[in-house]
């Protein structure tokens, strides 16, 4: 994909994301005066799109091209994971001023923006654009490092799933259905007001000290209450808080954040980012529930938070949270400040991620070009033809070269120090007017030609019977 096309696509996606964020916000604001339409989505994006797209991509490339194609796809995905890790690290650095400047809803949405990269999974392969940065990783080391990463990823993913299921089983093992008719009537009324189509059972469990919702899908969700009495006003605040999580699909957002943490398990910043993101999800619901609330309601809500200090585990959402975040939430509840909506910021983040996705490269260690081009040939390749080419508007103009020294040309090409690009941006895209040197070698007794193109620090090679297609290499320096 050319840089121009990528830039335009990023602009469109950024604008659509900002508009979608504002649209979802307006939909959610309707809850102040009316009910949501049944099934209405108010989250920025379905959190599980990226994990599903990655799984489908792996299956497709495995079936289409076998283990070799899957390996190339995995190498390209590594760069995508690296970008997500960098994004979360940068977001952590600016999180404190962002929380003071923009709404908690925008801060929560920023953690979900990498999910928009799901459609780029299919176009990260063999991108022709020039790389913004090149990461050097010898190909001999990639396979063992990938194996270590894969073991860590799968191990952490399984551990998270098992931990969640064990916690869910612990919560529901001794839970009993709620029997209070007035409470259930109030709960069902709030379900209808929030546009939730399916009934979500309410249970009481001795294992919890704070109200929470467990389950990633409506059919598996349960609202779990501790065994204590609540007034009607307290129940309204509790139900509104938990239903905001439900209509925003926050339990699946936590599943997505856990998936991203597993992808970047070697990066400690991603573990910190996961905790900060969970805090922002709670702050965002506090903000939504208490919008336009009077001081008495805010005080009642703050008392509920203080009475229910607990830490959420697994893929759950809970009214209160860990002690280290409670002080910050109480400050926001009792002293609300005017903040920007943050829609433009969310759109700008989507633009930046899309514009830079696929612009990194993984390259092999530097070595002489002859090792890649000529070694292993049973016969000495002979130059068949040489052209000098350049792009002018929509045409490629070529001029054949005569009278060259074949031995000197071959020695020059073989002495170039190159780094083979085996993942990410290939650098084949050339600006208009760039001149290229095209050399075709024929191998006696063998079909096919070795086709080389040297231009602007990039050497591309199409080797017969290689099976990898056109190979792009970065030229570090000329030979002696």
Annotate the PLM regions.
Residues 127-128, 452:
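Intrinsically disordered/low-complexity terminal segments and short unstructured peptides
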Residues 22-53, 60-127, 134-362:
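Membrane-embedded and juxtamembrane structural elements of multi-pass membrane proteins
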Residues 2, 26, 37, 138, ...:
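Serine/threonine-rich low-complexity intrinsically disordered regions
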Residues 1-16, 71-81:
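Hydrophobic transmembrane alpha-helical segments in integral membrane proteins
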């Amino acid at each position: 994909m050319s840089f121009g096309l990528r830039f335009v696509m990023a602009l469109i996606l950024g604008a659509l994301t900002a508009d979608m964020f504002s649209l979802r916000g307006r939909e959610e604001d309707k809850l102040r005066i009316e009910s949501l339409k049944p099934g209405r989505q108010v989250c920025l994006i379905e959190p599980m799109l990226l994990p599903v797209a990655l799984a489908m991509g792996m299956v497709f490339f495995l079936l289409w091209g076998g283990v070799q194609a899957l390996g190339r796809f995995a190498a390209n995905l590594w760069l995508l994971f690296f970008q997500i890790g960098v994004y979360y690290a940068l977001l952590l650095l600016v999180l404190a001023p962002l929380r003071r400047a923009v709404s908690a809803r925008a801060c929560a949405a920023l953690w979900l923006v990498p999910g928009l990269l799901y459609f780029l999974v299919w176009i990260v392969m063999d991108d022709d654009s020039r790389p913004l940065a090149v990461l050097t990783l010898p190909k001999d080391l990639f396979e063992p490092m990938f194996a270590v990463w894969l073991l860590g990823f799968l191990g952490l993913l399984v551990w998270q799933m098992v931990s969640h299921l064990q916690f869910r089983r612990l919560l529901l093992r001794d839970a009993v259905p709620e029997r209070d008719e007035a409470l259930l009537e109030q709960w069902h009324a709030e379900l209808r007001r929030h546009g939730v189509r399916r009934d979500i059972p309410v249970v009481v469990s001795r294992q919890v000290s704070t109200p929470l919702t467990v389950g990633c899908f409506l059919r598996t969700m349960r609202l779990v209450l501790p065994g204590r009495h609540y007034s009607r006003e307290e129940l309204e605040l509790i139900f509104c808080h938990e239903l905001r999580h439900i209509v925003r699909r926050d339990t699946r957002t936590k599943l997505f954040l856990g998936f991203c943490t597993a992808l970047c398990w070697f990066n400690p910043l991603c573990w910190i980012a996961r905790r900060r993101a969970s805090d922002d999800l709670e702050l965002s619901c506090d903000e939504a529930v208490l919008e336009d609330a009077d001081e008495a309601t805010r005080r009642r809500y703050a008392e509920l938070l203080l009475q229910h200090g607990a830490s959420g585990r697994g893929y759950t959402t809970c009214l209160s949270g860990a002690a280290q975040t409670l002080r910050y939430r109480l400050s926001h509840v009792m002293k609300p400040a005017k903040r920007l909506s943050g829609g433009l910021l969310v759109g700008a983040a989507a633009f930046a991620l899309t514009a830079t996705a696929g612009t990194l490269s993984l390259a092999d260690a530097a070595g002489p070009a002859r090792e890649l081009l000529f070694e292993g040939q049973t016969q000495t390749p002979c130059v068949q033809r040489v052209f000098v080419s350049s792009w002018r508007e929509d045409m490629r103009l070529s001029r054949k070269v005569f009278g060259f020294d074949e031995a000197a040309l071959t020695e020059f090409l073989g002495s170039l120090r190159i780094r083979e690009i085996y993942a990410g941006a290939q650098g084949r895209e050339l600006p208009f007017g760039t001149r290229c040197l095209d050399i075709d070698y024929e191998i006696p007794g063998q079909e096919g030609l070795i086709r080389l193109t040297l231009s602007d620090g990039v050497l591309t090679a199409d080797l017969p019977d290689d099976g990898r297609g056109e190979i792009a290499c970065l030229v570090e320096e000329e030979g002696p």
